């Protein structure tokens, strides 16, 4: 009997399975139709598949594979999908109702996420939790603005993908991804995060924690109470000074060795210090520690502090950083984050200038002093440094293998090595018995987030650093190519289950990560389509068990922005403007997700101001004017106030001052600042609102001579606002980037460039990371920043002009064209054209023309009033007579521009690539030393690959400079109708020697003054 029953059950199950398979087969055409319709509706490609279709009474329940969850779903789309699915039922199933829908075992309605919002209010979210108010954040800058609608008090864990690692199998250090299109993923994703995303989060009030070194500075100075190692590789010893009643606080950091091996933890090799706190109004003398930097060369250095977290640690440790721009004060909550590196900020320090960090036991004003608390102190670190973690193949048979360090900046290395240097538990970064650093690296990043948050409200049941992490994001690029060179696009990944559990340690449902991933992906795609490419591909939103999205203790996602293997994607990927757009989109996605999560309003930080200028006012006043820039995508990004930053002479910019009541006229804002003769004053502005502050504007500078001709003032116009990727060529068989033609212009500096591309044959496929086929590039320049457009050349020119005895003011090119008052009283206009050039992006959008119609009109107005002109730039002829990028110039505009150059400025084009050796000599003078300019990429100033030959256009002009190697005319002087011009086919600011800059501008000014 038993056997009979079992047989019947088996047969029934078999029949059920068979019946289901028939139904699934019957619905295949339906799935195909839905796949097409979904793509038409959402633009997302997929292949909808059913795993099972179950009859339940007179209803059909659909169990789709993960293919359903891989698509974005909003409430109206979900409703449309149900209606469309029912309408497509085959005839034989038309009598059935549509029942439940699942993606694997997830109910369809759980996949629905709220739409991206733009009006500043949180969307209704099923994953909203009580607002978490981090009232005592890990790090807070004192006297800084608080952004109630930004990310104030939020802690965000963020990392760029991969990094240099030691491969035990091949016994060498190598990249985790291939070198393609002048970069590799290990370095490429940094170029979005470090210069853009991180400062945007910080400008909104958030604090960023990273498992990879964020500072590209190769020098590293450590000041500590313990003896510190100093040796080769940019490692230097700072000075430690201690005053007051400090006592031993137990084990702490010490840098005792040239290299660290295995899982050695430098935070256990030394000691730390402690002192009882006193209140802000205490009459006791405060105890103090000073860590002196003694930096070896001027530059920007990240500052990290360390301390010990004890049961009675203070929540208000008062640190002060003294740097070239002044002093910046911080309050650090030492109840969390002990025995690791805690980042305060990046500051400019000068060689042989006082630079230090101090810590006092006095509680800062405005912070409550808790009785019986202590402040602790350990080492302070300045600069990122060079990697000092040595690795080797693990011995299996007693044989000793060679040990080596990467030899690269620590910022180029994988997370596994920084985590060791930062005192992380070896269980986090060494999970494979020292046999596989590749696995250790990707396994460590998400686990590190959990280690940081252990013991906090976000992760209360685990031990850790007690830092509440609000969210985490791993920023990657993907592989893959398209046969028609179309865009691969953007993929988002989250993980619904970790160890079979759908809850985060805080109790939240992990489905909140889908909402996070969808919002970030939506924001990226929408912004790219609006600003760069209307056809940008939105890929799927995956629920997959990737380590970086699975193990963090907070809402988390992994982003695959684009394909670093696809040429079409990388045309955008190397464009700094694209990187800014993406960085801003990711920041906005984080902001809007946290708004939904906590149910709080938001405001997007403003864009930088435009039309900026500085001019002479009354009685030694400088008048700074600017225009606010509204964001057409984000209505909440309108500015409500402004901050002005000031630099005097060779100093650094100060911490900024809020402009209380700026004047406004005709849409231009203005403020007056006192200035003194004999000094160069430089200014930049940032706009702010309740959501944060913008990136700084370009720099404008002004100076009044102590002696000289104060009546003859020079207006410096920065007509060099280009930022772009390198020149490229694109044919059916050959394509690539061509740095010999033009290497592009980074924004400030490029940290992604590793070497030039050498393989341009499209048909070559990837064979290995060492032989990656089309796009293959050298990596000999990895870790060396490439200087770009600093937007700070008015001070360079102005310094030479001031030495020559003339005053100067400056403005942007937009301000020069739009504000006719700036030229009034200007004896000469010094037009900085730098490496300005008409360029086009991958979709044909053109920008950065040197002599636009507006610029030509402005110069004509100036010369018509007897004003002189100095023009210098690498492409002042090429951009008129020729082209570098595949741009389209209207015939009438080209002819108009040629006539302008010849008749107004007095020159004609003699050709590009006028010099290979980049050496200039005075015309007709063979005895004078040659003047050199930068023609190869370097870390100091942008380079000029192809200077222009500039010849006299008429008998009223004559050559004054020529290129030494070719004899081609490099510059001319011209006598116009009541005015004079000097035009140079190279940028003055790229000259290698400051004395040469002085000499060239003095030569120009002398002729104009004759």
Region locations from a protein language model:
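Short beta-strand-plus-loop segments that form exposed binding edges in beta-rich domains
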Residues: 358-373
């Amino acid at each position: 009997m038993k056997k009979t029953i079992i047989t019947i059950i088996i047969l029934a199950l078999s029949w059920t399975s068979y019946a289901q398979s028939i139904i699934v087969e019957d619905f295949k055409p339906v799935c195909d139709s839905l796949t097409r319709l979904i793509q038409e509706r959402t633009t997302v490609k997929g292949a909808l598949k059913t795993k099972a279709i179950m009859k339940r009474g007179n209803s059909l329940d659909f169990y789709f594979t993960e293919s359903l969850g891989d698509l974005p779903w909003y409430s109206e789309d979900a409703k449309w999908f149900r209606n469309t699915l029912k309408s497509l039922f085959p005839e034989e199933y038309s009598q059935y109702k549509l029942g439940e829908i699942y993606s694997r075992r997830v109910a369809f309605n759980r996949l629905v996420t709220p739409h991206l919002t733009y009006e500043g209010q949180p969307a209704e979210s099923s994953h909203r939790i009580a607002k978490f108010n981090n009232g005592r954040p890990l790090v807070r800058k004192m006297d800084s603005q608080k952004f109630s609608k930004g990310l104030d008090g939020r802690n965000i864990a963020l990392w760029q993908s991969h990094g240099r690692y030691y491969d035990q199998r091949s016994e060498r250090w190598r990249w985790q991804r291939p070198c393609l299109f002048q970069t590799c993923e290990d370095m490429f994703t940094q170029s979005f995060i470090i210069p853009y995303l991180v400062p945007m989060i910080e400008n909104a009030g958030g604090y960023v924690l990273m498992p990879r070194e964020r500072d590209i500075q190769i020098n590293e100075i450590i000041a500590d109470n313990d003896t510190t190692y100093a040796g080769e590789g940019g490692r230097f010893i700072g000075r430690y000074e201690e005053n007051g009643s400090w006592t031993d606080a137990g084990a702490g950091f010490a840098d005792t060795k040239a290299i660290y091996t295995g899982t050695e933890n430098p935070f256990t090799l030394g000691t730390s210090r402690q002192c009882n706190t006193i209140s802000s109004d205490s009459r006791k003398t405060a105890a103090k520690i000073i860590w002196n930097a003694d930096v070896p060369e001027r530059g920007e250095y990240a500052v990290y502090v360390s301390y010990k977290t004890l049961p009675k640690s203070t929540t208000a440790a008062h640190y002060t950083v003294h740097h070239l721009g002044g002093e910046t004060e911080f309050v650090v909550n030492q109840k969390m984050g002990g025995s690791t590196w805690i980042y305060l900020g990046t500051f400019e320090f000068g060689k042989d200038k006082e630079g230090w960090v101090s810590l006092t036991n006095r509680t800062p004003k405005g912070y409550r002093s808790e009785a019986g608390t202590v402040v602790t102190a350990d080492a302070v670190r300045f600069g990122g440094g060079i990697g000092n973690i040595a690795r080797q193949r693990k011995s299996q048979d007693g044989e000793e293998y060679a040990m080596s360090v990467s030899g690269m900046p620590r910022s180029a290395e994988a997370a596994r090595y920084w985590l060791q240097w930062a005192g992380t538990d070896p269980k986090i970064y060494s999970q494979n018995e020292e046999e596989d650093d590749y696995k250790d690296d990707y396994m460590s990043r998400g686990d590190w987030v959990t280690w940081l948050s252990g013991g906090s409200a976000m992760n209360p049941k685990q031990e850790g650093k007690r830092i509440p992490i609000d969210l985490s994001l791993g920023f990657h690029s993907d592989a893959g190519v398209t046969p028609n060179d179309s865009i691969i696009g953007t993929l988002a990944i989250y993980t619904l289950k970790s160890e079979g559990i759908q809850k985060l340690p805080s109790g939240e449902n992990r489905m909140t990560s889908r909402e996070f991933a969808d919002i970030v992906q939506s924001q990226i795609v929408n912004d790219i389509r609006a600003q760069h490419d209307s056809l940008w591909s939105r890929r799927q939103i995956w629920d997959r068990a990737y380590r970086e999205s699975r193990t963090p203790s907070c809402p988390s996602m992994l982003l695959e922005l684009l394909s670093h293997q696809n040429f079409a994607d990388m045309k955008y990927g190397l464009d700094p403007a694209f990187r800014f757009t993406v960085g801003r989109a990711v920041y906005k996605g984080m902001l809007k997700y946290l708004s939904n999560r906590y149910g709080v309003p938001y405001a997007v930080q403003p864009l930088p101001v435009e039309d900026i200028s500085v001019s002479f006012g009354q009685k030694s006043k400088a008048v700074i004017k600017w225009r606010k820039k509204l964001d057409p995508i984000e209505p909440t990004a309108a500015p409500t106030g402004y901050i002005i930053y000031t630099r005097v002479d060779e100093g650094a910019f100060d911490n900024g001052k809020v402009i209380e009541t700026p004047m406004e006229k005709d849409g231009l804002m203005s403020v007056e600042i006192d200035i003194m003769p004999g000094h160069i004053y430089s200014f930049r502005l940032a706009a702010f609102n309740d959501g944060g502050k913008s990136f700084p504007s370009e720099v404008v500078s002004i100076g009044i001579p102590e002696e000289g001709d104060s009546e003859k003032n020079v207006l410096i116009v920065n007509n060099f606002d280009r930022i772009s990727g390198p020149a490229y060529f694109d044919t059916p068989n050959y394509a690539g980037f061509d740095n010999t033609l033009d290497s592009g212009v980074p924004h400030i500096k490029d940290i992604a460039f590793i070497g030039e591309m050498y393989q341009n044959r499209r048909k070559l496929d990837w064979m290995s990371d060492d032989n990656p086929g089309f796009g293959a590039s050298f990596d000999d320049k990895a870790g060396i920043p490439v200087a770009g457009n600093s937007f700070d050349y008015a001070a360079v020119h102005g310094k030479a002009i001031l030495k020559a005895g003339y005053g100067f003011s400056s403005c942007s090119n937009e301000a020069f064209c739009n504000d006719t008052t700036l030229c009034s009283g200007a004896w000469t206009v010094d037009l900085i054209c730098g490496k300005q050039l008409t360029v086009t992006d991958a979709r044909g959008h053109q920008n950065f023309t040197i002599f636009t119609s507006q610029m030509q009109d402005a110069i004509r107005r100036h010369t018509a009033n007897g004003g002189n002109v100095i023009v210098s730039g690498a492409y002042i002829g090429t951009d008129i007579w020729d082209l570098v990028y595949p741009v389209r110039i209207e015939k009438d505009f080209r002819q108009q521009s040629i006539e302008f150059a010849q008749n107004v400025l007095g020159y004609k084009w003699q050709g590009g690539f006028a010099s290979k050796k980049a050496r200039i000599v005075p015309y007709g003078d063979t005895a004078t030393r040659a003047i050199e300019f930068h023609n190869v990429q370097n870390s100091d100033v942008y380079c000029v690959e192809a200077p222009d030959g500039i010849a006299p256009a008429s008998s009223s002009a004559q050559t004054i400079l020529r290129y030494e190697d070719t004899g081609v005319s490099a510059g001319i002087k011209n006598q116009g109708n009541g005015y004079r011009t000097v035009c140079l086919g190279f940028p003055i600011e790229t000259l290698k020697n400051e004395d040469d800059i002085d000499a060239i501008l003095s030569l120009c000014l002398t002729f104009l003054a004759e």
